[in-house]
Amino acid sequence: MAERANLVFHNKVIDGTAIKRLISRLIDHFGMAYTSHILDQVKTLGFQQATATSISLGIDDLLTIPSKGWLVQDAEQQSWILEKHHHYGNVHAVEKLRQSIEIWYATSEYLRQEMNPNFRMTDPFNPVHMMSFSGARGNASQVHQLVGMRGLMSDPQGQMIDLPIQSNLREGLSLTEYIISCYGARKGVVDTAVRTSDAGYLTRRLVEVVQHIVVRRTDCGTIRGISVSPRNKNRMMSERIFIQTLIGRVLADDIYIGSRCVAFRNQDLGIGLVNRLITFGTQSISIRTPFTCRSTSWICRLCYGRSPTHGDLVELGEAVGIIAGQSIGEPGTQLTLRTFHTGGVFTGGTAEHVRAPYNGKIKFNEDLVHPTRTRHGHPAFLCYIDLSVIIESEDIIHSVTIPPKSFLLVQNDQYVESEQVIAEIREGTYTFHFKERVRKYIYSDSEGEMHWSTDVSHAPEFTYSNVHLLPKTSHLWILSGGSCGSSLIRFSIHKDQDQMNIPFLSAERKSISSLSVNNDQVSQKFFSSDFADPKKLGIYDYSELNGNLGTSHYNLIYSAIFHENSDLLAKRRRNRFLIPFQSIQEQEKEFIPQSGISVEIPINGIFRRNSIFAFFDDPRYRRKSSGILKYGTLKADSIIQKEDMIEYRGVQKIKTKYEMKVDRFFFIPEEVHILPESSAIMVQNYSIIGVDTRLTLNIRSQVGGLIRVEKKKKRIELKIFSGDIHFPDKTDKISRHSGILIPPGRGKKNSKESKKFKNWIYVQRITPTKKKFFVLVRPVATYEIADSINLATLFPQDLFREKDNIQLRVFNYILYGNGKPTRGISDTSIQLVRTCLVLNWDKNSSLEEVRAFFVEVSTKGLIQDFIRIGLVKSHISYIRKRNNSPDSGLISADHMNPFYSISPKSGILQQSLRQNHGTIRMFLNRNKESQSLLILSSSNCFRMGPFNHVKHHNVINQSIKKNTLITIKNSSGPLGTATPISNFYSFLPLLTYNQISLIKYFQLDNLKYIFQKINSYLIDENGIILNLDPYSNVVLNPFKLNWYFLHQNYHHNYCEETSTIISLGQFFCENVCIAKKEPHLKSGQVLIVQRDSAVIRSAKPYLATPGAKVHGHYSEILYEGDTLVTFIYEKSRSGDITQGLPKVEQVLEVRSIDSISLNLEKRIKGWNKCITRILGIPWGFLIGAELTIVQSRISLVNKIQKVYRSQGVQIHNRHIEIIVRQITSKVLVSEEGMSNVFLPGELIGLLRAERTGRALEEAICYRAVLLGITRASLNTQSFISEASFQETARVLAKAALRGRIDWLKGLKENVVLGGVIPAGTGFNKGLVHCSRQHTNIILEKKTKNLALFEGDMRDILFYHREFCDSSISKSDFSRI
């Protein structure tokens, strides 16, 4: 026992941790027996004192912290402001969640810190205080929940619940708080069972991988070591961790202070020596670890170090592998049981802040930072390198250095006050947290139409879906509008932009009685959902009525629905429309079938180069019968030339639909019937029939000719070829050829019947049997493709001028390939040639594609369709005239303007705002099949104005004769309507100088009203703005299909220039102030701008940051609860061991951890390549593998220690090192430069590969691999051990096939076979002696080579240490 004089006298309170340290020191000094005697006395003393001063705990002892009230109030205030910002669209949902969590976490932490001082001041002998803060029972976290606040809770998945529990358990919880609190309790109950089994399985795998590791030697003779330094280049290692790393280790090298040796090689380090080395300020200490031991199947005493049980060097025969496995696995099992007394309360961290020391002006270099958003959505600057920030005051200049990857929260030259936060240092730069990628789905709060305010790209992993990626921070807008599906009406008669009553779908009337305009004729139309008899069906359609409403009787000149194919309307696509080919006057004379120019826009609205923009199907190139198309180039064939015949044979095969242009083609008609397999056919194959012959029970032939019957898959094809049959003799060489065209005027010289053909003929050879054959001469229809049809005359000439390098050209194309059959179905006709308008632009332009879209504007029952193509300034337009009958059941009778009711008796215009009227907007659903309707009513809009404070410039007023009607109309304007303002288009029909319907209501005797000032702009529901050029007005005459431009030189004073703050189509977030003394706006989009007011459509903004995935297409209709956007963000898992254990398992199984990949495999490959290239072949593979293995080992040890240290669990590094050594000690033999010893792809030990390479004196190519603990257990030298772990049958079968031998070196094999385990007393000392002699022989043989190799290896390892010092991240250990 030590002398009393040498002992230090302590007189202070110690807690549980200090007692642990005291006990370990006692064992070091006095040994086990004496220590147990001392601890017995301490125990007796403790029980005596506890009995004398026992603590009683009552509910009154739980004292609530006085400052809790205002702390919670302050947090609620911050949360309310945050909610407002989210509502305005300034922060998105993830930023709001993060900020909310940090606000409440900080509040909870402040309360926790207040707790101890509060107890100390008010009641130092409070039983709760004494019990918890002495460490006797309970901890600060539990007391905090009793008297502070429970705070934020984790749900069973470890995710945060952002609603905090503000009450503590003393005050009692509300119902909501109680339910949230139960999540934590449930988490405890369920997770305890699950995690305990996980921890047990982890222990089993750990023991499995290292069970054979036994101390078998005193010294393996290695000269390698790992350097440990208290001062790394990046940061200081804490002294406590440094001491823990060194105690119990063995030095790998002598330590010199100056020229004096203070510690020698192979000396074990005790606490005294470590303290002396720290005092001397030793820079780096080289120690031996299990990593440096020269064998993988055992370990020596010096590389292991001291035994943790009795403080001496470990004994021979000690099963240190099993001890290591249990040391790592067991704390996990205990921690799973321990964690849940706090009930799933979230523990996290807040970022560190840099504050200004005093008032002053901020100065920094703006080139070194770039603007960004913080994780809370605040604007900030991110600095990449150390940034010097200078704060200038009146007489002091203070400099602060901001570390890299930090956020600067102030601007340059900004004035800051004392203690103001100027920078935020990221938490990740100091502590390593396991993070994970989390998806957060944002759902739409309301139904409406989606818009976004930036270009989006298509998400590459969702090629065929509607997911888009946002390239930059922008808003998504949901524009309001009530929606309803059109399932009640099979083909909705409501077109885009109709005016209608909102409750129209509740009407169950299926009939519409429609009165004609001039009451000449009353027609009754019926809806019917039964399409069995299309001839009796009539659908009321008003898509194209005659031009003058008051002249002729009610006449549907141009119908969109034909009786023959009644499902045409169902297939009508929203992205195609037809421009009628004839003028209106010609159409009145006769009912003309559907023909016109079809303008088609792709579904996505994007045209690429040489896209077909419009096409015209010429009725001259239509055929009703089936047949074969032939075309090509004239080519003389040598054989047929002798017979004086020219074959017209195509030499080019057509590849796509629109590829080849020809000037002449031939159509060979034939009658085709496709019959079911079971049909009874009444004619024979190769027989000749006449017209109207019965073919089957209900089919008769339309032409006469030769019958061909062909059986195909599950059907019979019956063809009738008309023409002449010719039986040739042997001299006719034409009989050898089949399928040729003969031009007119050519005959056969040698034949007896010499005749000339007037038209082209088609010669086809037919062979009914092998010997017999004949030739069928078939008539041919010849078509010449003339350039008479010129689409250019049908379009406005402006389109063909080269504006902005866009060109339109006309081409004729054949729709069917050469020799391809065309099949006509029943009565429909086949179009053979199509005239196309091809869109192209300048080759030098960088544009790969241009966008095109429709604009539809509805005014006074007129609908204009505009097409806009990229940069083209002129628009194509066509008109559909609507007639809404006055007494129609489903359509609003008041079709002029739903927001005005017209009294026919007085003719006075009365303004009446109707809430139940609206404008229809049509949509395709996501499956592109059925249509949805979006109804935009006045309840979705609000009016803003009048603008008393907005100045207008250069307004030229005009003298308009005072008229009461005009005054009312101009002054009132539409309130809350989404339809365009009437007074803009009201003068359009007047250009025809006809007194048509509009004039009845607005009797204007002054024609100058035509050229009135434009008081408003138009915007469509698409959000497309019809901008009017200030110097020219685009006016559409409803009776001709072209545009008029009224330039300023006609009436120089009709136009005005206004400059206002609000632009049309602009989006506003809520709370934006437009003018002084104006009310704050709600968020929305400007629909109508007048001189003194504006109408705004309500909208809800959602902020989205780059990388967010938007679900849905632009202007798609979304319903409430639809997924709008997905955010992907990183978040730290909450810090208890239940989340930590899976991370330990992931590291040990070498799986990548979600967002932070360990990247060890990649590092290994890179190192191998570089090192081999630098050092050359001889030792390249060995050294490359060594360095990567050293690097990955240290990284793994650090990551595992992080998890355990965060829980206050101390595990000695050597235990983790033994495990990590096993999973990093294998290399994979590669194919290049393969030697004859190992197979490519074989896993072998690194040292075995090294020895084999030296023995063969040639390089073996291999690379280091990381095995997980499971794979390492299945790749051992013992097949019995592998089979007892898992996959028993497979392992034993493979071992038998390979003829493997098990040397029974491990513990497990001997247990399985009932032998003596080679550890402890059963340790075989003879084995050690034999192996030592064997090693000495090898060393003598290879002394020269080995000395050379070890010198090289040492040099490279020293280089490696310096490299690692500079490259390992701050989160890693400084032990290399």
Curated annotation (Swiss-Prot):
Its main location: plastid. It catalyses: RNA(n) + a ribonucleoside 5'-triphosphate = RNA(n+1) + diphosphate. The keyword Endoplasmic reticulum does not apply. In plastids the minimal PEP RNA polymerase catalytic core is composed of four subunits: alpha, beta, beta', and beta''. When a (nuclear-encoded) sigma factor is associated with the core the holoenzyme is formed, which can initiate transcription. GO terms for biological process: DNA-templated transcription. This is DNA-directed RNA polymerase subunit beta''. Keywords: Chloroplast, DNA-directed RNA polymerase, Metal-binding, Nucleotidyltransferase, Plastid, Transcription, Transferase, Zinc. It holds the Pfam family RNA_pol_Rpb1_5. Binds 1 Zn(2+) ion per subunit. Its EC number is 2.7.7.6. DNA-dependent RNA polymerase catalyzes the transcription of DNA into RNA using the four ribonucleoside triphosphates as substrates. It is an enzyme of class 2 (transferase). It is found in: Plastid, Chloroplast. It comes from Arabidopsis thaliana (Mouse-ear cress). Its cofactor is Zn(2+). Belongs to the RNA polymerase beta' chain family. RpoC2 subfamily. GO terms for cellular component: chloroplast; chloroplast nucleoid; chloroplast stroma; DNA-directed RNA polymerase complex; mitochondrion. One of its GO terms (molecular function) is DNA-directed RNA polymerase activity. The keyword Methyltransferase does not apply. The lineage of its organism: Eukaryota, Viridiplantae, Streptophyta, Embryophyta, Tracheophyta. Zn(2+) binds at residues 220, 293, 300, 303.
